[in-house]
Regions:
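Glycine-rich beta-alpha loop elements in corrinoid/cobalamin-binding modules
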Residues: 1-101
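Radical SAM [4Fe-4S] cluster-binding motif and immediate context
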Residues: 108-295
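Short, surface-exposed connector motifs at secondary-structure boundaries
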Residues: 1, 24-26, 47-49, 190-194, ...
């Protein structure tokens, strides 16, 4: 059983789930991964998990399953995991493969998910839906990592030589791959709402503009739950109206607005000096987004 823990806020809930599963199904193998889990791996292992992935786990999970199917629990050959052996935490810190070409990743198996149940429950993004609204939605990523390295963010620490390796490096799927995934979601699964989970959708602004232009004809609603960096919505400190209008035309209805701080010193010291508070027309930016019916 695998349980992801991405944010600190999820930690208590995930560890409680682990406790309940171990109580009722002690023979089950419990895995965890994600940002929160990998940086707090020892606590997760002491809390009942058998294995924690300490980097991206697209290949790791397959290797674990291959060993488990043989009836073994010898994880010693699998890189970038921590696990429990005879009551002790073992750290397999040898480096594994960091996937730089995201088109190498297998096509997401959305068809294996009980999507109709997700649509009824409306979680984990249910807070962005109307109270009585049932939306046929799915999540996807067009990129991994981020071009910035802010001190408060895990990405700034996920560099070459770190425990997870350089998975914070900004990497993208090709335009063709992104459009193939979107068309599949709409045409094969009937999805109408897509949550973009990228840490930095506009990390390459020209690429993002190309994608938005292609998405227009799909007639989908788009939301970016992690936010779009303010600097990418600006041109010389003013609202980039071309981009904002294109977002609306492509179907963007909602996204998080990551101001990060209202203090210029904090932005410069801890937030990669991404934008200049004193020379940015934030009020104009907000008005431009609202004018285009984009909720923040």
């Amino acid at each position: 059983i695998g349980i992801t823990s991405i944010f600190s806020l999820q930690e208590t809930m995930v560890l409680h789930c682990c406790e309940l599963i171990k109580k009722h199904y002690p023979e089950k193998l419990l895995l965890s991964g994600g940002v929160n889990a990998r940086w707090r791996a020892d606590k997760f292992l002491n809390g009942g998990f058998d294995i924690v992935a300490t980097s991206e786990a697209e290949d790791t999970i397959k290797e674990i399953v291959q060993v488990y199917r043989k009836g073994s629990r010898d994880w010693s050959t699998i890189p970038q995991i921590k696990y429990i052996k005879e009551g002790k935490i073992i750290n397999n810190s040898q480096q594994g493969k960091v996937i730089m070409n995201l088109d190498e990743l297998p096509f997401p198996a959305w068809d294996l998910l009980p999507l109709d149940r997700y649509w009824k429950v409306r979680r984990g993004h249910g807070v962005m839906f109307g109270e009585e609204e049932e939306v046929k939605y799915a999540s996807m990523m067009t990129s991994l990592g981020c071009p910035f390295a802010c001190s408060y963010c895990h990405i700034g620490k996920e560099i070459k030589g770190s425990l997870p390796q350089e998975i914070g490096r900004f990497r993208i799927k090709s335009d063709e791959r992104v459009m193939e995934e979107l068309r599949y979601l709409k045409n094969e699964l009937g999805v109408k709402q897509v949550f973009i989970e990228d840490d930095s959708l506009f990390g390459r602004k020209k690429r993002a503009i190309r994608l938005l232009k292609q998405v227009i004809d799909l007639d989908l609603r788009l939301m970016d739950i992690n936010g779009i960096n303010i600097v990418h919505l600006l041109k010389k400190g003013k609202p980039d109206l071309e981009v904002i209008e294109l977002m609306a035309e492509a179907g963007f209805t909602d996204f998080s607005f990551p101001f990060e701080s209202g203090n210029d010193r904090i932005i410069k010291k801890w937030c990669s000096s991404k934008w200049d508070i004193n020379n940015t027309d934030i009020e104009g930016l907000i008005k431009a987004l609202k004018k285009n019916n984009i909720r923040m």
